[in-house]
């Protein structure tokens, strides 16, 4: 039973890693994970929350690895952007199957596949209760999907960027490797930088800090966690001023 019946946020930007879509498959997209995420997003829409989504592409392609093997980094990043479009198409389809109205906007024009990114239209769609999925990152190489999430979050004036990961918040060390790792419930931007905690890459993090965009890190693989985050029930770690 929720102790706080009113949602803590009105408009959110949900950042999902491509890896989150893999489930236990190790590669590609696990349909059952996709459908569960679509259902969790549907719950938010039914609460009246406006939802923007940015998905990574790491389950299908990673530009960095090939860049180290000699591929041009720009080419690798373009391939990574296209991987996020593939994930976006899968997510849009899953949402439609869950009877949720969703639009896919790409930072790279892909006529006939999805809409071009348009800021004013995105906000209009969010206000009308549509889920808007932002694909192809920022449209520029050398920018991570974390940067894209913060950029789109700032552009659509979201209340928070929710970063869905494999762990249930920010820890003092990697909880998978260090049993002594301590979870933080709340941090300031300065504390994250001082403690050199890995929340997201530095350019994305400083963009959020400079625009006072709160970041909330939570475990997307934990059923019901997304709803608890939205209801302000102390799920995950929040980072703000």
Swiss-Prot record:
Activity regulation (UniProt): Allosterically activated by GTP. Inhibited by UTP.
Pathway in which this enzyme or protein is active: Pyrimidine metabolism; CTP biosynthesis via de novo pathway; UDP from UMP (UMPK route): step 1/1
Top-rank taxon, per record: Bacteria
Keywords attached to this entry: Allosteric enzyme, ATP-binding, Cytoplasm, Kinase, Nucleotide-binding, Pyrimidine biosynthesis, Transferase
Enzyme class of the recorded protein, top EC level: transferase
Disulphide bonds in the chain: none
Residues engaged in binding UMP: 57, 77, 138-145
Localisation per UniProt entry: Cytoplasm
Coiled-coil portions: none
Enzyme Commission identifier(s): 2.7.4.22
Region (Involved in allosteric activation by GTP): 23-28
BP GO terms, sorted: 'de novo' CTP biosynthetic process; UDP biosynthetic process
Keyword rRNA-binding listed: no
Binding site for ATP: 15-18, 58, 62, 165, 171, 174
Family per similarity comment: Belongs to the UMP kinase family.
PANTHER family, alphabetized: URIDYLATE KINASE (PTHR42833), URIDYLATE KINASE PUMPKIN, CHLOROPLASTIC (PTHR42833:SF4)
Subunit structure: Homohexamer.
Name used for this protein in its record: Uridylate kinase
Organism (species): Shewanella amazonensis (strain ATCC BAA-1098 / SB2B)
Chain's gene name: pyrH
């Amino acid at each position: 039973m929720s102790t706080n019946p009113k949602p803590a946020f009105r408009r959110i930007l949900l950042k999902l890693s491509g890896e989150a879509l893999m489930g236990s498959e190790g590669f590609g997209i696990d349909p059952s994970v996709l459908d569960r995420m679509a259902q969790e997003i549907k719950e938010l829409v039914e609460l009246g929350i406006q939802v923007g989504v940015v998905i990574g592409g790491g389950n299908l392609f990673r530009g960095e690895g090939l860049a180290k093997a000699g591929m041009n980094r720009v080419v690798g990043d373009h391939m990574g952007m296209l991987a996020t479009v593939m994930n976006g198409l899968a997510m849009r389809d899953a949402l439609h199957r869950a009877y949720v109205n969703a639009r896919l906007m790409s930072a790279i024009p892909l006529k006939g596949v999805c809409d071009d990114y348009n800021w004013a239209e995105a906000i209009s769609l969010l206000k009308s209760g549509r889920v808007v999925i932002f694909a192809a990152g920022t449209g520029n190489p050398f920018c991570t999907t974390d940067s894209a999430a913060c950029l789109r979050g700032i552009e659509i004036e979201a209340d928070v960027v929710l970063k869905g990961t494999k762990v249930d918040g920010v820890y003092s060390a990697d909880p998978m490797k260090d049993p002594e790792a301590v979870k933080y419930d709340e941090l300031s931007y300065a504390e994250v930088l001082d403690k050199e905690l890995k929340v997201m890459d530095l350019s994305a993090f400083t963009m959020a800090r400079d625009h006072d965009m709160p970041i909330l890190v939570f475990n997307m693989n934990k059923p019901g966690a997304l709803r608890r985050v939205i209801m302000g029930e102390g799920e995950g770690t929040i980072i703000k001023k």
